[in-house]
Amino acid sequence: MNKSPTACDVKRLTIMLVAGIVLSQLGVSATATSENSAARDLAAAKSFAFGGVGVAGLMSEGERNLRAVVERPDASQQLQAAFAHATLAGELYILIGLRRCDRAAYQKIIGSLARPNDDVEVARGCMISREPFRQLLSQIHDGRFDDYLSRPSW
């Protein structure tokens, strides 16, 4: 026996369809927000650190955020957008990321970058110190941090 849909069935189907569309859009929005949060957090970095830091030798939050951004297909765009409002430590991370994923963008920024005399908080192993921004910038330009992102994360 064929049963034709009632008005109640059509209404329920319509509500489910609309709810599905809304939920799928929220999922896309939440994903985009979490992807952008890594770039935003990277730009806000208070200190600069690569490799194991602290007593436990853990990966720094900045390195973890940089790795998350660099893995994205739009990494260069995210890094360049984040650079505009980055702290000095954030700028260093972003330059390392651009050097890896978009050399042309890296060269463009490095060529026009103001080189302040300010110091940046740096963590190396268990030691926290302040180092000149210019010195760290020179190390980035010399490729001293290039291999860190090639290593597997732990």
Region annotations inferred by a language model:
Residues 59-62, 91:
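Residue-level detector of extended alpha-helical repeat arrays and alpha-solenoid scaffolds
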